Amino acid sequence: MAKNFQSVLLLVCLSFLVIVSSPQNAVQADTLIGSCVWGATNYTSDCNAECKRRGYKGGHCGSFLNVNCWCE
């Protein structure tokens, strides 16, 4: 009886770990695509529009002094 209980408990724990670690439950991070600063190599005049053009929901300039274009 004890071995059967341990087996069931192990199965429940493993099932929980598989569900929790599945990719669809992960939070998707923003993606850095370039710079929002004049004169930079990857300058994007409109970060939000460029992100939408690439298939993201939108974008924003962020990080220290808002120098990076992040898509979400």
UniProtKB/Swiss-Prot annotation:
SUPFAM superfamilies tied to this protein: Scorpion toxin-like
Tissue-specificity statement: Hemolymph and midgut.
GO BP of this protein: defense response to fungus; innate immune response; killing of cells of another organism
Lineage top rank: taxon: Eukaryota
Localization, UniProt: Secreted
Keyword set includes Ubl conjugation: no
InterPro entries reported for this sequence: Defensin_invertebrate/fungal (IPR001542), Scorpion_toxin-like (IPR003614), Scorpion_toxin-like_sf (IPR036574)
Function: Has antifungal activity against A.niger (MIC=2.1 uM), C.albicans (MIC=8.5 uM), C.fructus (MIC=8.5 uM), F.oxysporum (MIC=16.9 uM), P.pastoris (MIC=16.9 uM), P.tannophilus (MIC=8.5 uM), T.harzianum (MIC=4.2 uM), and Z.marxianus (MIC=8.5 uM). Lacks antibacterial activity against the Gram-positive bacteria L.monocytogenes, M.luteus, S.aureus, and S.lutea, and the Gram-negative bacteria E.coli D31, E.coli ATCC 25922, and S.typhimurium.
Family: Belongs to the invertebrate defensin family. Type 2 subfamily.
Protein name: Defensin
The species this protein was found in: Galleria mellonella (Greater wax moth)
